[in-house]
Amino acid sequence: MGCCLTVGPNEALVVSGACCGSDAKTYVVGGWAWAWWLISDTQRITLEIMTLQPKCEDVETAEGVAITVTGVAQVKVMTDQDLLAVACEQFLGKSVMEIKAVVLQTLEGHLRSILGTLTVEQIYQDRDEFARLVREVAAPDVGRMGIEILSFTIKDVYDKLDYLSSLGKTQTAAVQRDADIGVAEAERDAGIREAECKKEMMDVKFLADTRMADSKRELELQKAAFNQEVNTKKAESQLAYELEAAKEQQKIRLEEIEIEVVQRKKQISIEEKEIERTEKELIATVKRPAEAEAYKMQQLAEGQKLKKVLIAQAESEKIRKIGEAEAISISSVGKAEAESMRLKAEAYQQYGEAAKTALVLEALPKIAGKVAAPLARTNEIVILSGDGSRVSGEVNRLLAELPVSINALTGVDLSKMPLLQKMTGAQA
């Protein structure tokens, strides 16, 4: 006989042994199995996660710095049939602590070997990469035990020589410096980004304003086009209305003109008849008497003209007769004067200087009259002289200068005439 055994999902049931010396093994996870009494063996192995805390103390790194590293690993037995059989071969019958001890030693060994290939900075600054290397190196070894590494992380890294502390201070200073630089660069980038954002905002605003202005302009253009079209239609309508009104006014005016023409024709006919009547009346009242009066005046004018012609002819004859008489008289006087001049010339030739003297003396009154003509218009002559005998001296001087003036005017030298020589000598 036998019994039925069950197992939960966190354990694996291994049934081994059978009749007739069979070595078949049955691995059951989360199920049941039949086991024969006395000839079958049943064992259990846990499938739960096992937490390990590997620790490597004073392990020298690639630079020879001794550090201590602690980690946390999560491992479990794999449920694959073949790998589960391997795990059962390795750990079946062992407690969880024994299994954890085996795996822990394996992980610590790999952790120690990897620490020797890295620097402190690589281990300290990039723990994830360090953990990944440990996991990759240790996974094949623990896998051959049927164990799977679910996770492995570095918990702590420290040393006894304050190397990491000094490195941390340096790193802190560098980080602080980088932080300050980062802050400055961030502020710079923020300022640049803010300026770019403002520029983009202004560009967007300007673009929006431009589009708004374009839209407004398009709207205004469309309004203007619509208004122009409306105004054009209104103008065309108004023009058509005015044209029709003008045509109607023209028709009315033509009819009025026709009426005026008819009225004017009637008026002209009446005026023509009135003119004919007036002409007949004028002929009867004015023309006939005027013609009679004109004939009368014409006859009177012809009589006056004939009278004036006869009078003019008589006057002309009178003037002609008078002219002929005056011509005869002038001719006789001229002949007498010519004869007188001839006789005078003969006498002047006969008497010589005496005749010339007579002529000069005869001309002296006329010369004196011409010379004194300007003085005739003078009311009074005042001679200023302190001596009364001065007047007679002035008169004598004028008389002494007289022959010179006569000689200049007539060419006759009176100073050579005996009579004047005697007169001037007596005066002297």
Swiss-Prot record:
One Pfam match: Band_7
Broad class of the protein's primary localization: membrane
Annotated tissue distribution: Normally expressed in growing retinal exons of newly differentiated ganglion cells at the retinal margin. After optic nerve injury, expressed in all retinal ganglion cells and retinal axons. Also expressed in endothelial cells, spinal cord, larval and adult skin, muscle processes, thymus and gill macrophages.
GO annotations of cellular component type: endocytic vesicle; endosome; flotillin complex
Source superkingdom: Eukaryota
Induction and repression of expression: By optic nerve injury.
Database matches in InterPro entries: Band_7, Band_7/SPFH_dom_sf, Flotillin_C, Flotillin_fam
Gene3D superfamilies per UniProt: Band 7 domain (3.30.479.30)
The record's account of how the chain is modified after translation: Palmitoylation may be required for the formation of higher order complexes and for neurite outgrowth in cultured neural stem cells.
Compartment annotation: Membrane; Endosome
Disulfide bonds: none
GO molecular function, one term: protease binding
Presence of the UniProt keyword Repressor in the record: no
UniProt key word Transmembrane: no
BP GO terms, sorted: cell adhesion; protein localization to plasma membrane; regulation of myoblast differentiation
Keywords: Cell adhesion, Endosome, Lipoprotein, Membrane, Palmitate
Lipidated sites in chain (S-palmitoyl cysteine): 4, 19-20
Similarity comment: Belongs to the band 7/mec-2 family. Flotillin subfamily.
PANTHER family named among the record's database cross-references: FLOTILLIN-1-RELATED, FLOTILLIN-RELATED
Assembly mode: Heterooligomeric complex of flotillins 1 and 2.
Function: May play a role in axon growth and regeneration. May be involved in epidermal cell adhesion and epidermal structure and function.
Designated name of the protein: Flotillin-2
Organism the protein comes from: Carassius auratus (Goldfish)
